[in-house]
Amino acid sequence: MKIYDRNRNALTAGQRVMIAATGAVDVLKEAHTDNLTPYQAEHQKCVLLANSREHYAPIELIRLG
């Protein structure tokens, strides 16, 4: 399933993203959206970033570049 950042830009693995709350820049590693509705995929913490130990909701991210 496609996921989108807070500005409705499509997100895919390998893209640089910024965490909106902190301004930290990281790389999207993977998104676990199996068995989620489109609304859940956008708002649940299902995205894993390369250098972070936390999961993020796509709506918390901003795609860079």
Model regions and ranges:
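Intrinsically disordered, low-complexity, charged/polar segments
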Residues: 43-65
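Short acidic/polar mixed-charge low-complexity motifs
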Residues: 22-25, 53-55
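Intrinsic disorder/low-complexity segments in short proteins, especially the signal peptide
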Residues: 16, 33, 53-54
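Mixed-charge, Lys/Arg-rich low-complexity intrinsically disordered regions
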Residues: 1-16
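Short beta-strand-centered aromatic/proline hotspots
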Residues: 23-37
